[in-house]
A protein has these predicted regions:
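PAPS-dependent sulfotransferase catalytic core
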Residues: 1-55, 61, 182-188
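Short beta->alpha connector loops
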Residues: 11, 61-66, 154-155
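Amphipathic alpha-helical interface surfaces
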Residues: 54, 66-67, 90, 132
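The conserved 3'-phosphoadenosine-5'-phosphosulfate
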Residues: 33-43, 87, 137-194
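Conserved beta-strand scaffold positions in the cores of enzyme catalytic domains, especially
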Residues: 29, 57, 80, 147-149
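PAPS-dependent sulfotransferase catalytic domain
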Residues: 23-27, 43-46, 51-52, 68-167
Length: 194
């Protein structure tokens, strides 16, 4: 079975760009909606391996919330890429990407924010973002060869990704997807695709 690559960063951290880079490397990306409550991520689901077998890359929600299940099911065949950026820059990017939907999107990602007053949401969103990143890093503390942390805006991403995956660096320039991120993520109708 091929390695499974799970991108577990929050949106606004370079996930779309990283997906494009992985596609340039010939990786097949899952692009279908998934209901996280469907039981698809349950280890006892007999269809799981066959359903995911043709794909190499799984990005964003709900996959980023089920990386532990993937690691448990695919074990040594599962690699994690955590995309990160400065927390304040991340929050600003989410807000600037689409002001009319930002609150709704943050509440989808972090359900415990719904009841908060507007003044509390920024602090809570940033704390949730940092907690998510630390949880991922802590989970892989003993198997750090299975995780790559890519910081938004840093150079040498091709080399870091290719070294991590054990493939040659392509001649293509590393993609830039910021505008595509804003168009694609915030125009989705279904939260299951986000």
């Amino acid at each position: 079975m091929k390695d499974k690559i799970i991108l577990v960063g929050c949106h606004g951290t370079g996930i779309s760009t990283t997906v494009k880079a992985l596609e340039i490397l010939g990786k097949k990306v899952w692009k279908k909606p998934v209901d996280p409550k469907s039981g698809l991520f349950d280890k006892s689901n007999k269809k799981l391996e066959s359903k995911f077998a043709p794909y190499d890359v799984f990005a964003g929600l709900p996959f980023s919330n089920h990386y532990k299940n993937f690691k448990d099911i695919f074990d040594d065949k599962c690699k994690i890429i955590l995309t990160v950026r400065d927390p304040l820059d991340w929050y600003s990017e989410i807000l600037s990407a689409n002001k009319s939907k930002n609150e709704h999107i943050l509440e989808q990602v972090f359900s415990d924010m719904e009841a908060l007053k507007k003044s509390q949401k920024k602090k809570k969103a940033i704390q949730n973002y940092m907690d998510h990143n630390m949880e991922v890093i802590d989970f892989f503390a003993e198997k750090d060869e299975d995780i790559l942390i890519l910081e938004y805006g840093k150079h040498n991403k091709w080399k870091r990704i290719c070294d991590f995956l054990g493939v040659d660096v392509p001649e293509d320039k590393y993609p830039k997807m910021k505008d595509d991120f804003k168009k694609s993520i915030f125009s989705l109708k279904s939260p299951l695709l986000f």
